[in-house]
Amino acid sequence: MRITFNDVKTSLGITESYDIVNAIRNSQGDSFKSYVPLATADNVAEVGAGILINQTVQNDFITSLVDRIGLVVIRQVSLNNPLKKFKKGQIPLGRTIEEIYTDITKEKQYDAEEAEHKVFEREMPNVKTLFHERNRQGFYHQTIQDDSLKTAFVSWGNFESFVSSIINAIYNSAEVDEYEYMKLLVDNYYSKGLFTTVKIDEPTSSTGALTEFVKKMRATARKLTLPQGSRDWNSMAVRTRSYMEDLHLIIDADLEAELDVDVLAKAFNMNRTDFLGNVTVIDGFASTGLEAVLVDKDWFMVYDNLHKMETVRNPRGLYWNYYYHVWQTLSVSRSANAVAFVSGDVPAVTQVIVSPNIAAVKQGGKQQFTAYVRATDGKDHKVVWSVEGGSTGTAITGDGLLSVSGNEENQLTVKATVDIGTEDKPNLVVGEAVVSIRPNNASGGAQA
């Protein structure tokens, strides 16, 4: 993941190493130019002497080299983090991103008599809202000694090494950390049971297991892209679909080495070249049994908030400290399709989703809830409904219909529970919804 000086020249649009000095020289005032001559292939010592002549010129040179030139290279250089292609871009202002998804509405039966007095009744849309906050505010610190600057102007080759070392010292660290943070998004999502899980045999254990893995992946990709959409493949159980070209497979290097790329491309109904752009190979997942994930391109919610370089001189120590600040929003979209292919021991139920997960109900009103059970064993599992925090008269039926007491004032928690354990050793998987209570004279309907 090392940046070469050719990378530096390409990102800056220059052909010679001394063009960097001239770019800095052109950005400075007359005083700087009076000391530092126009750089050529033959006057490196003269250029170095001019830069080293006094502290003001040195400071101007280092500040421009690190704060401006270095930052341009870091932004433009080839992408080394294999997950970087999923980043959404830059949002420099604010620290919160609001994601809104409006689910489909339910069919109503025509009734001529009801139409007369319900024509102006409001039907609030089933809107899901998620907030993604800035959660990475780090910086990278490096030092440039006076002696390093002096040595840099022995030759243009030394100068190239000097510039490359400055950029690599911070770029490699920032790239590796960003990669690890983005991988962690996958493992955290899996550990919380938010992926839809497809159980498989360990693909590398046999040819048959590898073939079966490809079949299941092909079937899953097909289901994700059906035009009517589905609630089965995202952790909010909203009805949505993906397009085949938007599906990305993330796998580790060991599994990728066993797979036939041409066979995989056919599974996704894509040509080999296009498909390779939708396969991301990583060094491995932290979660045991997690073999691969198939995600929509909109699943990652990663934004750059700030990339900034700052330089300061320490006159007592005869060195410059430079700091590269990286602020980011690192998150994922729970309304986007995301599937995990898992071997080994997999729970029979990985998640229970209650919809709507947020509701506002009038005193004396009702709200229908639905439970979506993410099962990996292909079986139907009994859902037990309960409501907590309510007063006498507030109750929920066995099919998820909540009735709120006319005197209810407390916030309620509706729970849908599936027991995948035994009578002696229960193992509960619980989904929840939060219900706020509105006074009986409040207007509007229930909201999701």
From Swiss-Prot:
Annotated Gene Ontology cellular component terms: T=3 icosahedral viral capsid
Coiled-coil segments: 104-127
UniProt-listed Gene3D superfamilies: 2.60.40.1080
Domain BIG2: start-end pairs: 348-425
Keywords: Capsid protein, Coiled coil, Late protein, T=3 icosahedral capsid protein, Virion
Signal peptide (residue range): none
Transmembrane helix among keywords: no
InterPro entries named in the record: Big_2
Pfam families according to UniProt: Big_2
Compartment(s): Virion
SMART domains reported for this sequence: BID_2
Keyword Coiled coil attached: yes
Subunit record text: Homohexamer. Homopentamer. The prolate capsid is composed of pentamers and hexamers of the capsid protein.
Its biological purpose: Assembles to form a prolate capsid shell of about 54 nm in length and 45 nm in width, with a T=3, Q=5 symmetry.
Assigned protein family: Belongs to the phi29likevirus major capsid protein family.
Annotated protein name in UniProt: Major capsid protein
Species annotation: Bacillus phage PZA
